[in-house]
Curated annotation (Swiss-Prot):
Residues 23-35 have a biased composition (Gly residues). Keywords: Ribonucleoprotein, Ribosomal protein, RNA-binding, rRNA-binding. It comes from Limosilactobacillus fermentum (strain NBRC 3956 / LMG 18251) (Lactobacillus fermentum). InterPro entries: Ribosomal_uL15, Ribosomal_uL15/eL18, Ribosomal_uL15/eL18_sf, Ribosomal_uL15_bac-type, Ribosomal_uL15_CS. This is Large ribosomal subunit protein uL15. Binds to the 23S rRNA. The lineage of its organism: Bacteria, Bacillati, Bacillota, Bacilli, Lactobacillales. One of its GO terms (biological process) is translation. SUPFAM superfamilies: Ribosomal proteins L15p and L18e. Residues 1-55 are annotated as: Disordered. The keyword Cytoplasm does not apply. The gene is rplO. GO terms for cellular component: cytosolic large ribosomal subunit.
Amino acid sequence: MQLNELKPVAGSRFKRLRKGRGLSSGHGFTSGRGTKGQKAHGKTRLGFEGGQMPLYRQKPKRGFTSMDHKDFALVSLTTLNQFEDGAEVTPEVLVANGVIKNVKSGVKVLATGKLEKKLTVKANKFSASAVKAIEAAGGTTEVI
């Protein structure tokens, strides 16, 4: 057997259907849509249910988007372990080291994982358990 003799398994490769390309193709003229009617002439819009009241209009509106919502960049204690012992960690340092993409509305430190380094952490928000964990490791926290 040579490389040039290799053939795909029978039935594994299909030729793409080219609809609307002449009567002799077998898929010309109406392109497999039947004759006349809404479905033959064009596409129905997204969510259209044939004239029946669509589900998205049957259900009542709920809730709203708060204009006061702040999107904090989240940082875990495990992530803070990459800094040297005694280092000062600020939002600018986190961005510079590629830990977070941007500061957004600020940085919130969460107590995910374990902190093994003594750090001075400056952030906009801390979870209560994160403050305990940082201070237990000998570090300090500062809300900016």
